[in-house]
Regions:
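C-terminal tail/sorting-segment detector
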Residues: 279-296
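Active-site machinery of serine-nucleophile hydrolases
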Residues: 58, 62-117
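C-terminal catalytic histidine-bearing segment of alpha/beta-hydrolase fold enzymes
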Residues: 181-183, 189-243
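A conserved short beta-strand
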Residues: 155-167
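A domain-start/cap signature at the N-terminus of enzymes
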Residues: 6, 21-58, 95, 137-139, ...
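Residue-level detector of functionally pivotal "anchor" positions at catalytic/ligand-binding pockets or at interdomain
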Residues: 241-267
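Gly/Ser-rich "nucleophile elbow"/oxyanion-hole loop immediately N-terminal to the catalytic nucleophile
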Residues: 51, 105-140
Length: 296
């Protein structure tokens, strides 16, 4: 289950270039730095676009607890991102790949679930991703956050892969609406195999589409690093909205009604600027607003 090699070159102020170096692909793509401000919470994130086949999918990766902060850099060092990015390049999949960074005083739960939803909404709307497939991944705290997103937003995601996470506080009825593949290690001293296995049993009792791999001898760290194999990613990306029976990629209880573009000095803009700093606002049908500080 070794990871396919991928090199990472750090480019200050521009992004992160992922380049497959095993000779199988020439596809390169850059993770550019952006931020979102929603409900008074500022969250940095990275976004990359892969130019591949088919309609673009939205891919989200949630990092573990040791990568929290506001440098928009530390979260990119997790091995799972390399594995997923490499897979997208090798398979020539068309995707928008998001990697948010959780603030140091937060976790992937509570108000951060709403911030993540606003991030998804922003890219679904601004990049015309209506009816797109949305996939979510995460390890450790990010695995727990992935479970929590499935619980908070049923039918939003096409498929999910929470790794070494804790689903104990999640609503099984909601989570059961999404195909899920989870991986746990028997030597994990942080997350409980029994908790994950019991929750999978609850999902199966509700007719959910699930896979659970329990790896003998894997520690928490090893599980977070080695779980994203080609075979498992094939299973995740093999699901689409038609095959999964998912009706609507956006939760119907809070839909984006309009989008506004504003300069940093508060002037309303008629369209998104081609370059420079500006603020993008999503106006929801319940009156709430999510703001994004954008740099092009």
């Amino acid at each position: 289950m070794g990871l396919e090699k991928i090199s990472r070159i750090w480019i200050p102020l521009i992004g992160i270039l992922f380049c497959v170096v095993d000779g199988k692909s020439e596809n390169n793509f850059v993770f550019e730095a952006e931020k979102i401000v929603s409900a008074g919470i500022e969250m940095p994130y990275r976004v990359a676009h892969t130019n591949g086949l088919g309609n673009p999918a939205l891919v989200i990766y949630l990092h573990g607890g040791s990568s929290k902060g506001n440098d928009n850099d530390t979260q990119m060092k997790e091995a799972g991102i390399d594995s997923i990015a490499n897979y997208l390049a090798l398979k020539k999949l068309n995707a928008v790949h998001l990697v948010p960074q959780c603030p140091s005083d937060k976790s992937w739960g509570g108000p951060m679930l709403g911030v993540l939803k606003a991030l998804i909404d922003r890219h679904v709307l601004s990049e015309s991703l209506d009816n797109t497939d949305i996939y979510i991944f995460g390890g450790s705290m990010g695995g727990t956050g992935t479970w929590s997103m499935l619980s908070a937003y049923p039918r939003l995601f096409t498929a999910a892969m929470p790794v070494a996470g804790n689903p104990s506080k999640c609503d099984a009825d909601n989570v059961a609406t999404t195909p899920v593949y989870t991986v746990m290690g028997t030597s994990d001293r942080i997350m409980s195999v029994e908790t994950a296995s019991g929750f999978i049993d609850e999902l199966n009792a509700r007719g959910a589409i699930t896979r659970l791999d329990i790896e003998e001898g894997w520690t928490h760290e090893v599980t977070c690093i080695q779980s994203y194999t080609t075979k498992r990613l094939d299973w995740i990306f093999g699901h689409n909205r038609n095959s999964s029976g998912i009706e609507n990629p956006v939760a119907e209880d809070n839909i984006v009604k309009s989008i506004q573009y504003v300069s940093l000095d508060g002037r309303q803009l008629s369209e998104s600027p081609c370059k420079g700093f500006y603020i993008e606002r999503l106006i929801y049908n319940d009156g709430t607003v999510a703001s994004f500080k954008i740099f092009k």
